[in-house]
Amino acid sequence: MRFLDAGETHGKALIAIIEGFPAHVKIDIENINHLLQLRQRGYGRGKRMEIEKDRVKILSGVRNSFTTGAPITLMIENRDYENWRSFMDATQCDVDTKKVTVPRPGHADLAGCLKYEFDDARNVLERASARETAIRVAVGAVCEELLKMFGIKLYNHVVEIGRVRLTKSYSFDDTELFEQALSSSDLFCIDKEAEMKMKEEIDIAKQIGDSVGGIAEVICKNVPYGIGSHVHWDRKLDAQIAHSVMSIQSVKGVEIGMGFEAARRFGSEVHDEIYYDDKKGFYRKTNNAGGIEGGISNGMDIVVRAAFKPIPTLYKPLKSVDIRTFQPAEAAVERSDICAVPAGSIVMRAAIAYVLANALIERLGGDSAKTMLETFKRIYNKG
């Protein structure tokens, strides 16, 4: 399975085509729209979220709510396009009024202009914008519909904003806690006290014209053993997850399980001891590996965290240089968020769902979900 997406932040629409998705998967379009709505939420989001009300349109590959095995085409229209039509029309438009010649530090602006020989960063930022993640969330939501058939569920929450960390202890089995945070917390945080301090951190950044990043976590439940492989570098499940998550705008680090903390411990404190029970089979009492060993899922929860850097658009701009005159200038200011970590956790969830679905298709054979279920039952003695 693979997908390609296209579209600009102020273009007509965002499009994705998913190829190789199995037939006979029931698609509930409202589940997709629900995740799109969650992506738009979050304390610290910008004015753009007041304009866009993202809803997906399925243009192909699904009939009577079931996938057919044909390429699935998804589209999310950009409402803001009407305000930008005269600047973004594909045939003829005003390219001068919205021209951006002072790149923002931390954004793709300068590197993109140098690579593609542009004198206008608009041609870079329109595609590099995190607006693109809306369609990636839709793709991930479709993949979650497949994963649900095998009992696999994903949960996301925010564990850190700026200098404020979640201190409340929790278990990866606290799924109701994660679900409550999605429905009731502006930051998808399971700890109300920490959430209040996180909001204060965002408020401080807003007051001084700055931005703030953070860390999000995704827990994948009921992933069977044997997904991914050790035999080649590009088939390792953890490598694929890291690749997918690192491709999200603003992500600067990914860790699985204990992650970077493992580098500070002795091996005896890190590796999960193996036990066996006639009823449970092989099991562990700890999950420092985060559900993956040697690039293969081991049957434990897969736990992934990502570090999101602060958004590079600052309302108190940093120093930069005008690419036309080469003279010092303040960085360009585009409409932007102060903090997008909660939204980033939804995108992260989608990125991981895609990897898991693809690995599951490879493991079980992916032309038909019916055949996949039969193979799943045979391998894992389910049902």
UniProtKB/Swiss-Prot annotation:
One of its GO terms (biological process) is amino acid biosynthetic process. One of its GO terms (cellular component) is cytosol. GO terms for molecular function: chorismate synthase activity; FMN binding. Its EC number is 4.2.3.5. FMN binds at residues 127-129, 249-250, 294, 309-313, 335. Keywords: Amino-acid biosynthesis, Aromatic amino acid biosynthesis, FAD, Flavoprotein, FMN, Lyase, NADP. NADP(+) binds at residues 39, 45. Reduced FMN (FMNH(2)). Pfam families: Chorismate_synt (PF01264). Pathway: Metabolic intermediate biosynthesis; chorismate biosynthesis; chorismate from D-erythrose 4-phosphate and phosphoenolpyruvate: step 7/7. Its cofactor is FMNH2. It catalyses: 5-O-(1-carboxyvinyl)-3-phosphoshikimate = chorismate + phosphate. InterPro entries: Chorismate_synth, Chorismate_synth_AroC_sf, Chorismate_synthase_CS. Belongs to the chorismate synthase family. PANTHER family: CHORISMATE SYNTHASE. Homotetramer. This reaction introduces a second double bond into the aromatic ring system. This is Chorismate synthase. It comes from Caldicellulosiruptor bescii (strain ATCC BAA-1888 / DSM 6725 / KCTC 15123 / Z-1320) (Anaerocellum thermophilum).
